[in-house]
Amino acid sequence: MQTAYWVMVMMMVWITAPLSEGGKLNGEIRGLVSHILIPQHTLRSLTSRDRSDNGGSSGAQICIWKVCPPSPWR
């Protein structure tokens, strides 16, 4: 329970830190947060786990915030 609370607090700081003056605080906080907790790493680990479970790439696109990259054959 304490870990979940700490992760929630750190994610709130991660979201609000870019609002700080000049982004200096944001850079310092990023240095304190483990690279495992950053959203990009979490997304990457979820997609790699999904691909390994399916036995390879199924050709499905991952859309973030409902914005999908265009397919090369469109």
UniProtKB/Swiss-Prot annotation:
Propeptide position ranges: 23-57
Modification sites for D-tryptophan: 65
GO terms, molecular function: toxin activity
Signal peptide: 1-22
Family membership noted in the UniProt record: Belongs to the conotoxin C superfamily. Consomatin family.
Gene Ontology CC: extracellular region
Disulfide bonds: 63-68
Domain of life: Eukaryota
Membrane-spanning intervals of the chain: none
Protein name as it appears in the record: Consomatin Ma1
Modified residues (4-hydroxyproline): 69-70, 72
Function: Moderately activates human somatostatin receptors (SSTR) with a preferential activation of SSTR1 and SSTR4. In vivo, does not cause behavioral changes in mice within a few minutes of intracranial injection, but causes a progressive loss of movement thereafter. Four to five hours after injection, mice recover, even with the highest dose tested. Shows antinociception and antihyperalgesia activities in two mouse models of acute pain, most probably by acting outside the central nervous system.
Note: This peptide is an evolutionarily optimized stable analog of somatostatin. In addition, it adopts nearly identical conformations as in the somatostatin drug analog Octreotide. As this drug, it contains a D-Trp at the same position, whose synthesis is a common strategy used for enhancing the metabolic stability of compounds in drug design. Consomatins evolved by gene duplication of a 'Somatostatin and related peptides (SSRP)' gene expressed in the snail neuroendocrine system.
Tissue expression summary: Expressed by the venom duct.
Location relative to the cell: Secreted
Keywords: D-amino acid, Disulfide bond, G-protein coupled receptor impairing toxin, Hydroxylation, Secreted, Signal, Toxin
Taxonomic source organism: Conus magus (Magical cone)
Free-text domain note: The cysteine framework is C-C.
